[in-house]
Design a protein with these regions (language model features):
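Active-site flanking residues adjacent to catalytic metal/cofactor-binding acidic residues
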Residues: 78, 115-116
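Short acidic, glycine-rich surface-loop motifs adjacent to enzyme active sites
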Residues: 65-86
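Alpha-helix capping/helix-boundary segments
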Residues: 82, 118-119
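Extended active-site neighborhood of metal-dependent phosphoesterases/phosphodiesterases
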Residues: 1-70, 90-113, 119-172
Length: 173
């Protein structure tokens, strides 16, 4: 995310020029993997971003998902979790979450992987979060290999242990 960009679209240019598309999919024998940039940059606001999806991403999903066999494992990777990380504060746009969940509800095997929070957490989405699939949707908030950035008790060399808030040590995600 380029915080110097004038718009959400411009904030993705460096990523796209370095790595390629910010929305993509690939298929393996029994699984389909979808990666989506779900960071919506809002220049000049506080906070400067919110979790959500763009119209072009929904267009991609609406065109692609009908081609995916329902017996495949569907793995979605995003950055910002789809659950609201802070009670009472919308950290992922509810309308986008409901729209995404409506597209996924007929897939019986879905795993949602998210990051951003530098902690590990398992969330089971149900009707209270607009998930209407046959079973709860499993979201695994993976944590971060860097741990909790440069925080925590310092070792003899002055390097902090960076243990995540859930107790996961640096280097494990």
């Amino acid at each position: 995310l380029d915080f110097d960009a004038a718009s959400d679209e411009e904030s993705l240019l460096t990523f796209r020029n370095t790595f390629g598309p910010d929305s993509f999919a690939w298929e393996e024998a029994r699984a389909v993997f979808i990666g989506l940039d779900d960071v919506i940059y809002q220049p000049g606001t506080k906070p400067a971003y919110i979790g959500g999806l763009r119209d072009d991403q929904f267009n991609f999903l609406e065109a692609y998902l009908p081609t995916v066999p329902k017996d495949r494992l569907l793995v979605l990777g995003v950055h910002i979790p789809l659950f609201d990380a802070k009670p009472g504060i919308e950290t992922f746009r509810k309308t986008d979450r409901a729209r995404l969940f409506a597209l996924l509800k007929d897939f019986p095997h879905v795993l949602l992987l998210s990051g951003h929070d530098h902690t590990q957490r398992h969330v089971r989405h149900g009707a209270e979060n607009d998930w209407h699939g046959a079973t709860p949707l499993h979201e695994y908030n993976v944590g971060a290999a860097c741990g909790a950035f440069w925080s925590g008790v310092k070792d003899a060399a002055g390097i902090p242990d960076s243990t995540m808030s859930d107790g996961t040590p640096n280097g494990y995600a």
